[in-house]
Amino acid sequence: MVSIAVSGCAQIGAPTGGPRDSIPPVLITASPKLFTTNFKGNKITLIFNEYINVLDVQKNVLVSPFPKTSPVIDFKLKTVSIKLIDTLIDNTTYAINFGNAIVDNNENNPFKEFTYVFSTGSTIDSLKLSGKVLMAETGKPDSTLQALLYRNANDSSVEKRKPDYIAKIDANGKFTFTNLSEGIYRIYALKDGDGGKTYNSKIESFAFADADIIVAAIPDSVLLYAYEEEKEKKKIPSVAVKSAADKKLKFTPAPSKNLQQDLSSNFELHFNNTLKNFDTTKIVLTDTSNNKIEGITISLDSTRKIVSIKNKWPVNTYYRLIIAKDAVSDSANNLLAKSDTFHFKSKSESDYGSLTLRFTKIDLAKHPVIQFLAASEIVRSVAVTGSNWSDKLFIPGEYELRILYDANNNGIWDPGNYEKKLQPEKAITLDKKLTIRADWDNERDIDL
């Protein structure tokens, strides 16, 4: 795809009244004609049967092979004119793919998937290469990526020069290169962050094939898995100067909703400031008779803003958490305004649903992990070690299910590394979501 200069005349107004025009424009004449061989000129003219527009040329029009200098596309009334600026390569088939960019002036009916093809040699190359790109972490397609194809390439070509061919990736992750000559190619996929058409940032989504691709008379298909080697760092918004009230050390208990403690989670205190000092002896968990609960673990997380109380929570049990005023202090030596006591209870079994998953055709040798996602965030991951898995106390809600093939068996998804030629770990997102109902036996058969 190239950055294409484009100009056009003022739009011709559509007539009012009558039935809606649903007929796309028709190509009447192409000069030189479509599939011309031994092409020598630098101008192409397309004449249609009605007034047309060319929409979003930069996005919709692909020129292959990729020229060094962009052609100029001009449209006026019923005519599209293309001026080729770049020197054409001998014995090469060129394709100018307009996609759905050419539309009629009245109702924007597209002249669908139109490609103007010509050759500077005596034949038109007609080989194709199709494939699919999926995001490795999710197993889902991403149509914002593009497929890149190189001739006469080495490992560094994708980092140093623009590709010879580019293909769009559709909503299903599929792509097709057309009008190729027989030969050896290298294929990649890229979400191009800076428009340079090269892989130059580890935060760009990228995919590569393990070996060269041979394009021959018998068509082949390629499957690529894209990844970001490094996650883009989120921009931290500027912080307004705190008022005196905001500077006070405060915290919020979690869970805060009705103070119902999940049986498998820690009770947490979320502080507004980073803690400097932290005294576990001044944070006490008791029962309702004021008997101290032994065997708990109190810890501070790496951000030094979350205090966690870990305990084996029996069902439907009431607790008190007593926090002394000087139990914690922040970097400005602020203490809590006062000592505080929280009353809460652990949940009952009826607050949960029972879940049983039965797996068919799952490859345990690939170390599968079942991931439960809520609002696109992984809330639980469980290694699959057999054909059945169950949990009697599963938090109700709607979950997206994902199977991660954890190659290095570390429990998390790992990206690829192009320099080391390491492919990313792969995952599959299941089509059907899982709904867990409280106080209910929930079951799902998963056929992979």
Regions from the language model: what does each represent?
Residues K112-E113, D192-E232, A337-D340, S348-S350, ...:
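Structured interaction patches on ligand/partner-binding surfaces of diverse proteins
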